[in-house]
UniProtKB/Swiss-Prot annotation:
Location of the DNA-binding region in this protein: 43-62
Gene Ontology MF terms: DNA binding
CDD domains (UniProt xref): HTH_XRE
Domain HTH cro/C1-type residue range list: 32-86
Keywords assigned: DNA-binding, Transcription, Transcription regulation
Keyword hit for DNA-binding: yes
Superkingdom classification of source: Archaea
Name under which the protein is recorded: Uncharacterized HTH-type transcriptional regulator MJ1545
Pfam annotation, one family: HTH_3
Entry-linked InterPro entries: Cro/C1-type_HTH, Lambda_DNA-bd_dom_sf, Tscrpt_reg_HTH_MJ1545_prd
Length: 241
């Protein structure tokens, strides 16, 4: 019984956060679509659960219908959560980890989810990056996390590492103050969860450790370098909508 109430409380916490994010968003429709995409749920699947036609979901998301009230937003969000629970609750668990993040997460310098995904090619241009491994320019990126690699190694536990992925693993995981890239790629390799792309800041492409390159190839993760200083890098990343 105790576990049940703990689970319910945490679900309410997640739901309240998402509802608040949608209500306060400048564009409600885009916010609805963003969260549906983060849960990796198709319009037709959500419409079936809510017992409405897919066109109704589409109309709200693209703004053809007037902004939905709080009750409709609540039903929309609770449906996302229930569908995710039926699939194992992986997204809910990720959200909970972020909302309950520990004090040791000082290593995270910036974390953000994008309203609309951008391609790997667009992302590389934004950060003045060079691709060391991989060439899939159409790879979608839904967010980013910038982490101080030294603090991460010294302060973060294995459980803390999962906080780096925000609401979704479909993101760029960016390590600053990198010397060879070996430690970040080893950390990614041993983790069950994998980012969409890894960025190493402050290192030349030809200076990346051979093992780091090999691990990126094994996990099929694009590996990028950038020479932007940390402040400018975060500034550009935070300008992505």
């Amino acid at each position: 019984m105790t576990f049940y109430f703990y689970f319910v409380i945490n679900m309410e916490k997640v739901a309240i956060y998402i509802i608040g994010d949608i209500v306060l968003a400048e564009n409600t429709g885009k916010a609805l679509k963003k969260w549906r995409n983060l849960f990796n749920i198709q319009q037709i699947e959500l419409a079936k659960y809510l017992n409405v036609s897919p066109s109704v979901i589409s109309d709200y998301e693209v703004g053809r219908r007037k902004n939905p009230g709080v009750n409709i937003i609540k039903k929309y969000v609770l449906a996302l959560i229930e569908i995710d629970k039926e699939k194992g609750g992986q997204t809910i668990k990720a959200l909970k980890r972020i909302l309950d993040k520990s004090p040791s997460m000082k290593a995270i310098l910036s974390i953000k989810e994008y309203e609309n995904p951008i391609t790997l090619n667009e992302f590389v241009n934004i950060i003045d990056g060079e691709i060391a491994v991989g060439d899939n320019s159409d790879t979608p990126i839904y967010g980013h996390t910038v982490v101080d690699s030294i603090k991460a190694i010294l302060e973060m536990t294995g459980d803390d590492f999962y906080h780096l992925y925000g609401w979704t693993t479909e993101r760029a995981l960016i390590f600053t103050n990198v010397s060879t890239g070996r430690s970040p790629m080893v950390a990614v390799r041993v983790s069950i969860m994998k980012p969409r792309v890894v960025v190493l800041q402050g290192i030349n492409k030809d200076k990346i450790d051979s093992l780091a390159l090999k691990l990126a190839e094994i996990d099929n993760i694009p590996l990028i370098t950038t020479h932007l200083d940390t402040k400018e890098l975060i500034k550009r990343l935070n300008e992505i909508k």
